[in-house]
């Protein structure tokens, strides 16, 4: 079963992206994505949607 999660910028804290992941995975998602507020690519970490 997949759950919806938000990806939050590690620098400014904006929730810029929403995606899904498997519920049975223990580790959280951490992706390098573009942040429009910071105007650069930053690490985005998983948070509750």
Swiss-Prot record:
GO CC annotations on file: cytoplasm; ribonucleoprotein complex; ribosome
GO biological process: translation
Signal sequence, renumbered to the chain: none
Pfam family, one: Ribosomal_L33
Keywords: Ribonucleoprotein, Ribosomal protein
InterPro entries according to UniProt: Ribosomal_bL33, Ribosomal_bL33_sf, Ribosomal_zn-bd
MF annotations from Gene Ontology: structural constituent of ribosome
Family: Belongs to the bacterial ribosomal protein bL33 family.
Database matches in PANTHER family: 50S RIBOSOMAL PROTEIN L33, CHLOROPLASTIC, LARGE RIBOSOMAL SUBUNIT PROTEIN BL33A
HAMAP family, A to Z: Ribosomal_bL33
Protein known as: Large ribosomal subunit protein bL33
Species of origin: Thermosipho melanesiensis (strain DSM 12029 / CIP 104789 / BI429)
Lineage: Bacteria, Thermotogati, Thermotogota, Thermotogae, Thermotogales
